[in-house]
A protein has these predicted regions:
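N-terminal signal-anchor transmembrane alpha-helix
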Residues: 1-31
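Membrane-water interface at the C-terminal end of transmembrane alpha helices
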Residues: 5-17, 115-134
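Alpha-helical transmembrane segments of multi-pass integral membrane proteins
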Residues: 12-13, 47-49
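Alpha-helical transmembrane segments of multipass membrane proteins
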Residues: 16-25, 56, 60, 84-88, ...
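Internal alpha-helical transmembrane segments of multi-pass membrane proteins
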Residues: 38, 61, 65-83
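Non-cytosolic membrane-interface motifs at loop->transmembrane helix junctions
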Residues: 38-44, 99-112
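Canonical alpha-helical transmembrane segments
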Residues: 50-66
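Membrane-helix boundary connector in multi-pass membrane proteins
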Residues: 89-108, 126
């Protein structure tokens, strides 16, 4: 039911994404073998999730303003950004100080955070936001 403002839809996306990512964190982080790894801390997950949702909401507002079919365009942009968001995770071992000690399972978990956030955010913004009045 499309009845919310972008702001409310973004808040729903934010809460849903944070909850999903924290569930993933608490279930799977112990299996990664990574201790004291800031991206796998609750605060790190919350901060990076909030940044992603905030950025997506801004992009959706812009796309919605200028596109005749904002849902399709935003979904495509989101898919491209999701794939690009994997690059820092993939290259973390080479780029970060101490990254060579990062486990593959930790990197996969970071990618899972991106996917969960993207799915929830795209759904909330495109399905819950009221149509733009011209």
């Amino acid at each position: 039911m499309k009845t919310h403002s972008i702001f409310v839809s973004a808040l729903i996306a934010l809460v849903g994404s944070i909850v999903a990512n924290l569930v993933l964190l608490f279930i799977f982080a112990p299996l990664t073998g990574m201790v004291n790894f800031p991206p796998l801390s609750a605060s790190g997950v919350i901060i990076f999730t909030a940044a992603g949702v905030f950025g997506a909401a801004i992009v959706y507002a812009i796309v919605r303003r200028f596109s005749a079919n904002p849902t399709r365009l935003f979904t495509r942009i989101s898919a491209v950004v999701l794939v690009l968001s994997f690059l820092p995770d993939i290259f973390f071992r080479q780029l970060a100080a101490g990254g060579e000690n990062t486990t593959s399972s930790a990197i996969v978990l970071l990618m899972a955070f991106h996917v969960a956030c993207a799915v929830i955010t795209v759904w909330a913004l495109t399905r819950l936001t009221a149509p733009r009045i011209s």
